[in-house]
């Protein structure tokens, strides 16, 4: 994870443990998640690695008829946090020019993060609803209606009260400075320091509620939503062949144990397993070329979502033909692309290396074993590791594995052996588990 993700996930966990407060993943996007901003949720998302929202560059006010502006969001309280995070080695941190970056990421003992929560007042929303209708001819609304998208309104945010620089000396093991990792974009040494400055007014986490459109220009934002609710009335969407992905896990259902994650991943791998041997091999080749190119993976994800929206066959060079002939297969691939794009580019490159060295089964077993024992563990701790989990690995393979899981927050120490469990890293470990499961399946017969 990047340092910014470490900050936002830990903050969301402390303010709203296992709740509906969504941590912001990218510092560069914080201005697009202010109150009243309209966002989209990824169709094939899962709460295991977070309901994933993407900005739209529009606010609710932009798509309403002209009229009076609502009152400013109200302040719901201030909070201060000290010693909130533990820095971890990471690859290059991708942040906007306005953010000062030194090294790669963490929190110093002297740093204090002061935040406030801002929310849209119920009276302000009620007055806005009475006074301003939807602009029915707005191009953005027309496009979203045509695609059958669900829109969400940011209703509450947690933002910084002042600029703060978070820093701490890196905890890199010696292995991270070996030349072996240079091509993977990993850096760090025992004494390496890292820091990032987060600007005042930066949104760190947010809550959303679904926008509902009734008829041509009526709208509402209900307090409670379920997975059957859609922003636009179903009867108004053209084309009956559209394929809309809806999962029970998309709407606030919290998962109780590792078994639920395992079953979810197995359901998706079963769809991939139905592909022909040639199709699976082709898919593995395509993914091997894309891993480490996060932007290209994200572009493929968006294109595939678009293909599902259109409801007809499309041609995608990155995917084998029999994937595109099956909506269920496309659905499953979209699920795994969501998991892989959660991982850093460095981790994606490590996955390719692991694939080449045929050690994916060992890595999958390691992640599965630790999550099975600690999935509900809500406190940090050091736990013994079964020696046989790593005994089959050579030195280079062991280093590779330590780096791969370490970048998801699972620190493995050979002495013992043992590992450090941090509950804040659970979403990233879930994504890594899904990614390993897919690649292991695809590589079995290759």
Swiss-Prot record:
Q: What Pfam families is this protein classified in?
A: Gasdermin, Gasdermin_C
Protein's UniProt keywords contain Kinase: no
**Membrane-traversing stretches:** 78-95, 99-120, 164-180, 184-198
Q: Which residue positions hold the site described (Microbial infection) Cleavage?
A: 247-248
Alphabetized, the UniProt keywords read: Cell membrane, Cytoplasm, Lipoprotein, Membrane, Necrosis, Palmitate, Transmembrane, Transmembrane beta strand
Q: At which positions is a cardiolipin bound?
A: 9-13
GO BP terms: namely:
programmed cell death
Which superkingdom does the taxonomy of this entry point to? Eukaryota
Null allele phenotype:
Mice are highly susceptible to subcutaneous group A Streptococcus (GAS) infection in an animal model. Mice lacking Gsdma, Gsdma2 and Gsdma3 are highly susceptible to subcutaneous group A Streptococcus (GAS) infection in an animal model.
- Family annotation (InterPro entries): Gasdermin, Gasdermin_pore, Gasdermin_PUB
**How would you describe the post-translational modification of this protein?**
Cleavage by bacterial SpeB relieves autoinhibition by releasing the N-terminal moiety (Gasdermin-A, N-terminal) that initiates pyroptosis. Palmitoylated.
Tell me yes or no: is Transmembrane among this UniProt entry's keywords. yes
Give the span(s) annotated as Triggers pyroptosis. Answer: 1-252
Question: Where does the entry say this protein is expressed, by tissue?
Answer: Expressed predominantly in the gastrointestinal (GI) tract and in the skin at a lower level. In the GI tract, the expression is highly restricted to the esophagus and forestomach.
List the GO cellular component terms: cytoplasm; cytosol; perinuclear region of cytoplasm; plasma membrane
Family note? Belongs to the gasdermin family.
Record remark on domains:
Intramolecular interactions between N- and C-terminal domains are important for autoinhibition in the absence of activation signal. The intrinsic pyroptosis-inducing activity is carried by the N-terminal domain.
Q: What is this protein called?
A: Gasdermin-A
Species this chain originates from: Mus musculus
Supply the gene name.
Gsdma
């Amino acid at each position: 994870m990047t340092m910014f993700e470490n900050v936002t996930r830990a903050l969301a966990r402390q303010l709203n443990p296992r709740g509906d407060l969504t941590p912001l993943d990218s510092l560069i996007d914080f201005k697009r998640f202010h109150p009243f901003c309209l966002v989209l949720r990824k169709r094939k998302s899962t709460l295991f690695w977070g309901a994933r929202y993407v900005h739209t560059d529009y606010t609710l006010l932009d798509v309403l008829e002209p009229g009076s502006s609502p009152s400013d969001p109200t302040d719901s309280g201030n909070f201060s946090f000290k010693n909130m995070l533990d820095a971890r080695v990471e690859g290059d941190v991708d942040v906007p020019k306005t953010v000062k970056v030194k090294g790669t990421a963490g929190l110093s003992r002297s740093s204090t993060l002061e935040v406030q929560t801002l929310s849209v007042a119920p009276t302000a929303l009620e007055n806005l609803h009475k006074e301003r209708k939807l602009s029915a001819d707005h191009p953005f609304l027309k496009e979203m209606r045509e695609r059958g998208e669900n829109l969400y309104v940011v209703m509450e945010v947690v933002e910084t009260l002042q600029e703060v620089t978070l820093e701490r000396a890196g905890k890199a093991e010696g292995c991270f400075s070996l030349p072996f990792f240079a091509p993977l974009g990993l850096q760090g040494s025992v004494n390496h320091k890292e820091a990032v400055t987060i600007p005042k007014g930066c949104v760190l986490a947010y809550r959303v509620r679904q926008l509902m459109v009734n008829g041509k220009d009526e709208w509402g934002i209900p307090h409670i939503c379920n997975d059957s609710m859609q922003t636009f009335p179903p009867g108004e969407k053209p084309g009956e062949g559209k394929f809309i992905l809806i999962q029970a896990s998309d709407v606030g259902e919290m998962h109780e144990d590792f078994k639920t994650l395992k079953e979810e991943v197995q359901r998706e791998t079963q769809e991939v397993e139905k592909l022909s041997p040639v199709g699976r091999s082709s898919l593995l080749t395509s993914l091997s070329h894309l891993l480490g190119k996060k932007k290209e993976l994200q572009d493929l994800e968006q294109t595939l979502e678009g293909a599902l929206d259109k409801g007809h066959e499309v041609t995608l060079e990155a995917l084998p033909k029999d994937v595109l002939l099956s909506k269920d297969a496309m659905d499953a691939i979209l699920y795994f692309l969501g998991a892989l794009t959660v991982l850093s580019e460095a981790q994606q490159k490590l996955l390719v290396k692991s694939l080449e060295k045929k050690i994916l089964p060992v890595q999958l077993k390691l992640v599965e074993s630790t999550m099975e024992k600690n999935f509900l563990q809500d406190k940090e701790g050091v736990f013994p590791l079964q020696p046989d989990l790593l005994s089959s690995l050579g030195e280079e393979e062991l280093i590779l594995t330590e780096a791969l899981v370490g970048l998801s927050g699972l620190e493995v120490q050979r002495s013992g052996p043992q590992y450090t469990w941090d509950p804040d890293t659970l979403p990233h470990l879930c994504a890594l588990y899904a990614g390993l499961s897919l690649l292991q399946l695809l590589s079995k017969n290759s």
